[in-house]
């Protein structure tokens, strides 16, 4: 849903994309929180954010696009290593498709978390998307 207007994102907006070779560094990955074994459980809680680059947002007609993911996993790898492998796998998936769009980024994250990484228990996705009005 568009945060600015409250309207649902149309299929055309979600699937319109840009070729991967046209834009360098289209996505920015950051880990916002890492809770190691909260409440003495055997799970780790990772919260990370994917931001769309200025050139990608300009090409797609987006004013702001933050995709926030909260992951429950039993992986015990260091945070930096997890982010580096995750980022590499997402870019690899997007390069195989050849087009970067909102739907393709979400599909890439889903593929990496549930097919590439093992021991992913649950993922909650929140987004902050604002399309250009003009």
Curated annotation (Swiss-Prot):
Q: Name one Pfam family in it.
A: Gemini_AL3
Q: Which InterPro entries match?
A: Gemini_AL3
Keyword hit for Zinc = no
Q: Which residue windows are transmembrane per the record?
A: none
Keyword match GTP-binding: no
Q: Which domain of life is it from?
A: Viruses
**Which BP terms in the Gene Ontology apply to this protein?**
viral process
Q: Which UniProt keywords apply?
A: Host-virus interaction
The record describes the protein's role as: Increases viral DNA accumulation. Enhances infectivity and symptom expression.
Assembly notes = Homooligomer. Interacts with the replication-associated protein (REP). Interacts with host proliferating cell nuclear antigen (PCNA). Interacts with host retinoblastoma-related protein 1 (RBR1), and may thereby deregulate the host cell cycle. Oligomerization and interaction with PCNA are necessary for optimal replication enhancement.
- In which family does this protein belong, per the annotation? Belongs to the geminiviridae replication enhancer protein family.
- Know the name of this protein? Replication enhancer protein
